[in-house]
Amino acid sequence: MTITVDIEIEDEAWTTAEADAEALVWRAAQAVLDAHEDIEGQGIVILLTDDDSVQALNRDFRKKDYATNVLSFPSPPNPEGQIGDIALAYGVCAREAAEQGKPLAHHLQHLVAHGVLHLLGYDHERDDEAEAMEALEREILAGLDVPDPYASDEEGR
């Protein structure tokens, strides 16, 4: 089944900072989908927006009144329906990339892969879940020539 990836750019800061942001998002999402052949659903919507919009979504749906890098909203399982929606906050993502000393393009692809995995049911609440999800992220990102996003985290552990 072909799954569509619709990308909506609400904050032009994304394309100002990263001219090929839409292509990067599509490649990262598609890499996750390609690694999962048994997906049921028609599509994913990915919104590239600003911190205020993500803060409002986080407050309204998660009761957490702050902006975060990425939010994933899985849809109820339905082979004929959407898999879910993802929203990414430009300011938070750009700040994190700068603080971590990595290109915004790499951080964006990581967060898209992370968000799509959440839509597919992956989580990181428990250590074993986090390890499995991070391993899958590393594998997918390696295929996109994105360095291990957790390398510096592990050095500090």
From Swiss-Prot:
Its cofactor is Zn(2+). It comes from the Bacteria. GO terms for molecular function: metalloendopeptidase activity; RNA endonuclease activity; zinc ion binding. Pfam families: YbeY (PF02130). One of its GO terms (biological process) is rRNA processing. Its EC number is 3.1.-.-. Binds 1 zinc ion. Its main location: cytoplasm. NCBIfam families: rRNA maturation RNase YbeY (TIGR00043). Single strand-specific metallo-endoribonuclease involved in late-stage 70S ribosome quality control and in maturation of the 3' terminus of the 16S rRNA. This is Endoribonuclease YbeY.
